């Protein structure tokens, strides 16, 4: 006997296990406040659960998960926009030192925090693109998720990297 609910639950558990870390990083990049971040992550998981019943395999599961997560996060940003905060036009960090001693770990943590702050200042579409890029999605996959052309995505990635690197160095990071 076929049980769609069990299949959906099994699929959700698999997706949650495989992409949970990426979803947490995405939520962290969108929300600074830990309570708001937890709410966003929960909202993403609920949306994923609901959406899996409609998943038809026309795209990869990875693309589906990122599309759902980014749509939820972007919608939330738009809804939560209360002030006319100026978003940075574009911005990337080329490398983060990978040291093992305690002081180096603290420096790395501070560097990552600063990178997340810079990413958070980006316009939602630019933030979405760079986060997908940092999750190692290729240009065609990012284009499919965002609805932009692959060429436009490639151009934006290049500009975002330049902007982030410039801001990172200009602000003494």
Give short role names for the model-derived ranges.
Residues 2-6, 10-12, 85-87, 91-94, ...:
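C-terminal edge and immediately downstream basic/flexible tail or linker adjoining helix-turn-helix-like DNA-binding
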Residues 39-46, 50, 59-71:
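Structural recognition of an alpha-helix C-terminal capping motif at a helix-to-coil junction
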Residues 56, 67-88, 104-108:
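Arg/Lys-rich amphipathic alpha helix in sigma70-family domain 2
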Residues 98-130, 135-140, 144:
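Amphipathic alpha-helical segment used for protein-protein interaction
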Residues 2-25, 35-38:
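A short, charge-rich alpha-helical start-of-domain segment used by transcription regulators
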Residues 20, 24, 45, 123, ...:
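C-terminal flanking helix
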Residues 70, 140-170:
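DNA-recognition helix of helix-turn-helix
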């Amino acid at each position: 006997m076929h049980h769609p609910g069990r299949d959906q639950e099994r699929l959700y558990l698999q997706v949650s296990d495989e992409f949970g870390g990426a979803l947490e990083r995405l939520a962290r990049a969108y929300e600074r406040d830990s309570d708001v971040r937890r709410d966003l992550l929960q909202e993403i998981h609920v949306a994923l659960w609901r959406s899996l019943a409609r998943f038809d395999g026309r795209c990869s599961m990875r693309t589906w998960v990122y599309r759902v997560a980014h749509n939820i996060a972007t919608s939330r940003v738009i809804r939560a926009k209360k002030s006319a905060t100026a978003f940075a036009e574009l911005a990337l960090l080329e490398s983060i030192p990978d040291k093992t001693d305690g002081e180096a770990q603290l420096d790395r943590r501070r560097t990552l925090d600063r990178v997340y702050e810079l990413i958070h200042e980006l316009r939602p579409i630019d933030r979405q693109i760079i986060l997908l890029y940092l999750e190692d999605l290729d240009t065609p996959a990012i284009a499919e998720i965002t609805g932009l052309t692959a060429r436009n995505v490639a151009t934006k990635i290049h500009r975002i990297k330049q902007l982030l690197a410039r801001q990172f160095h200009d602000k003494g990071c």
